[in-house]
UniProtKB/Swiss-Prot annotation:
It comes from the Bacteria. GO terms for molecular function: methylthioribulose 1-phosphate dehydratase activity; zinc ion binding. SUPFAM superfamilies: AraD/HMP-PK domain-like. This is Methylthioribulose-1-phosphate dehydratase.
Amino acid sequence: MSLENQTQKERLCAVIRQLHTQGKSPATSTNYSFLDEDQVIFVSRSGVDKSQFQPEDFIAVDTMGLPLPPDEGIKPSAETLIHCFIYQNFPGITCVLHTHSVAATLLSGIFAAKQAVTFSGYEVIKGIAGQTTHETAIALPIFANDQDMKSFCQQLAQRQEELNNYGFLIAKHGLYAWGETMAIAKRHLEVWEFMLECELEQLKITPPLAAR
């Protein structure tokens, strides 16, 4: 293994453990990955306590989600196919993060019928690549949960034009965010999570019609 890949594993481990500390990866849930320069995806192994996540807990797979040496005998998470879809369809992306925060889980259910949560006026919107002002509205699409990952990826393909803001929600499940570097992916995740938390707090004051 290259020194660069080992370094990336250690960096992503630190991010994963931090997200667990923040309550965004309960009960061994969530998954994370990075793509190296040889188009090898290193994705987090299923069933590992994210508070204890270590570099050896990554599995190497190709862009179709098939395990590569020395991990051929290990079955990766079914959601690996979502990571593969993102890398295949958004050239230049090198990191994908998936969290299960309370805000993402609840709001994705509340607004599932609208197929998106829309944010406007937030200063942190400018943390999403390509956004230059808070004076705009930006949508985070919501997709129905589906245990069949091939079927789910077909949903993504059908609405791919909605995925240009580096994130989406799965109803009553969680958030996916990505970026051209690990730092950018983390920034995108933090922006979405912050705005979701703000909207959830706002619901406590003024519930929308969808929540009544």
